[in-house]
Amino acid sequence: MKNTKPKVRLWSVLTGLTAILTVAAIVGNIIANQYATTINVALNASTYKIIHGENTGDTEYFKKGFASDEEREAYEAELCATVEAEGAALLKNENNALPLASGAKVSLFGHGSVDLMYGGTGSGSVDTSKAPNLKQALEAQGITINQTLWDLYSSDSMMSKYSRMTPASISDTLEANTQYAVNEAPWSALSSAESSFAEYGDAAIVVLSRSGGEGADLPSGENGTSDSWISGQEGDGNYLALSAEEVELLQNLKALKDNGTFKNIIVLINSSNAIELDFLNPEICGEDYGIDAAMWIGDVGQTGINGVGQLLSGAVTPSGSLVDTYLYDNMANPAMYNFYTQAYPNAAEYNLLTEGADVQGMYSVYQEGIYLGYRYFETRYEDVVMGTAKAGDYNWATTVAYPFGYGDSYTTFAYSNFNVTESDDAFTVTLKVTNTGKTFSGKETVQIYFQSPYTAYDKANGIEKAAAELCGFAKTDVLAPGASEDVTITVPKSELRTYDANNAKTYIVDAGDYYFTAATDSHNAVNNILAAKGYTVENTNGRMTENGNTDLVWKWTNDTLDTTTFSTGANGTAITNLFDESDPNKSSDAPGSVTWMSRSDWTGTIPTAPAQLTANETLAASLAFTKYDGSEANSVEMPTLGAKNGLTLASMIGKDFDDPEWDTLLDQLTYSEMVNTITLGFHNTAAAASIGKTATKDENGPQGLTAALTGGASAMCYTSEDVMAATFNVDLINEVGRCIGEDCLAMGYSGLYGPGINMHRTAYCGRNFEYYSEDPFVAGTICAAEVQGIQSKGVYVYLKHVALNDSETSRRGVNTWLNEQTAREIYLEVADKAITDGGAWSVMTGFNRWGATWCGANANLLTGFLRGELGMRGMCITDFSGSSQYMDLVDGLIAGSDIWDSPTPKIHTTKAANYENDAYIVTQMRNAMHHILYTVVNSNAMNGWASTDTLKTITPWWQTAIYALIAVLAVLTILCAWQLSKAIKAKKSMVDTAPAADQK
């Protein structure tokens, strides 16, 4: 028989290959285990199983409100459309352009017409791949669309060449701004469809869309942005101005309107970032584009465009009101001069560099103070009208296109029987609202504003006052022509307080005259108050834009300065200065002095360039990643760990936060359980077997439940938050919240990263779609209603981002400087209302620093303000912290942070290993676990759990699969190596016996 040649080469290759695969699997397993938390969340992989004990009670603590997923989804689709229909604001409507006549035939223009902005980008983005488009929404209302033009805009060639461009990733740098592009199609690209225009000439509807997103602020043209990038051909680098192609489009449509091809031109503003509206006013822009109607629709969410269709067709009458001041030129906003971050000019001298996700040498100054949005535009207007010294050269009418609160209707309304009564702790405003139109039914938003006196005491102590502040609102039911409704609005006296940071160092109520008025918008409110003071258009030489209505004004006089009524917070906590270290004029870090904008000297204090600060040794030391030096390690007794007390987390259902039994439960925790829960909190809270704690799933976001980062289940995408606020409808947004809670309950989520509560400081913040407004009152009131709805289904919210994350540029560590009055009255007010009125459980802190102190390590913010003054009992989670060293574990724990939004043990888990014997830090961990567990035990995570149930740790299936793969590959490697060894021996044997064979 012929001998078979040994297969040495084959077995060598197979042995090498299986060995490489084995090593790769082992390395992959190591890497996967570092991201086990993220993988478990993404794959919905359990790390435990429940061992049920005896129980006869109902453990479904939070019940679903829908019989099926289909019922829930259908209801929410209608709800989203309703929010859009009540939130969109009609800005202009001439020549009866709107509503469209029944059966109208229209042409849709602009790339945005086929590619709407449904929401922003980043962690709050949602899947809208199945969302209806504008064509479908209009056709559902009996409107016929120019199919030829639609097909052209939506063709592959047009979509690839002229699509809107946005930043490709979350980068947080100024350079990301240059990735935004309008990229509108030039008029010449539409020539093939021009012959179809006349047949669909009832209206030319132009959609102007602008995108925003996480990690990238919008370019204003003031930051070196390439002109050519913004428009596709030419422009001024301002993303919120019309591009050259958009101007060309409007010019050509005007020509076609003039020759009779189109009857009307209608513009839809599809953006949560306020576009400059000079093009709507020929006297401002110098050219008449023939625009008959304009409507702001924001970001429409998954089905909100159906609401737009209802508005355009007249099925619903517009009732939304703007929640931002819209300008002709956005640079008229004083905050713009300090919006984009600055570098300390001597940062390198102190090694304050940006390394990876740690920004050390960048800062931003809120130099405008409380004068955000209408608080500036209307206050300076009042001072100009009254002839106040140093008011300067300011013309409201050429600055403001549409004021905060503005919203037109297809009908008209009248207010009468205005009355205000005072009680011990509130003012009650009543009035009658009548639909005075003859054709359309509709709702009306009633807005109540007040004015606080700007006194000599204020001027002496650096207190600023706005000419008007929103303090109450209500929305009527649908009123038929001629119908009326009596409206009652309660204004708590706490709305009148102002913060005195320099003398009383608490909230005060000034002595003097206070004015209350019912108004249609902020400008109307100031004119009413001016009228009550005796000012008219005539006696101010036209400085007043229109006469106010004194019948809608009521004056209340406070006889003496009150420094005590509002000087205490929750549980009697004294309210006093907490944020001096964020004020460069008071901070021990002394980066320099800042002149705050003041109405006592508009001309001398309005910024004309960014505020200049410099670094020093003290500031550099305050910016160190870790300040704790271990000196407190033995200052407290080491907490008990790993006790066998027999309690489970479910046994704490219904127990008060201060119940002594919590200590017994906390004694059972192990150090590793605390570290795992605290340092690996990316979209979850971890299971803890010692107390029978289940793992929970947390997810974004501001427009509804989305799993953009983890790949899990998503649900209804509602409108952007500004559209929600623009409804001015508390009950409607409470229902949105309830349905978001239903989505979470149906899909197994217990926590929601949202709502977003930062401010629209300027129009250029990338995440304005996630935030409600420039005004903290409407933002806080609407947020509180949404929070109540969400949490009614056992879903704890994380209000984000507390606080001052009002821009994206350099956000990972930027030093934010502001004074205390501004912090409290503007930037913390939404959280205040959401927690005290809405009962919000938890917060997510910002990436940014307050002065030199990271939000999550700011004890005055977390422990002093949130837990002390507001009485918050839930948890404080960081923003994403997996790659940032400045978001320090020990400093954060000491300040009051509880859980780090990190998917990897690389930084914080590793650091925790150094503190197992530090009693002080272990105590802080125990306190953090108390906050976490108290939140979870009051959530839907406890559905199905009884006090007798326990938990057993198991290996998740994907880890078992990897271990099995490694084992199989290892066995194959051994077998291949064995076969290789045999082959080598056989080959050697053949070589050794070859001569003998030859001799035969």
Q: Predicted regions: what is each one?
A:
Residues M1-Y499, D510-F516, S522, G572-K1000:
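Glycoside hydrolase catalytic-domain context in secreted enzymes
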Residues K493-F566:
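Terminal connector regions
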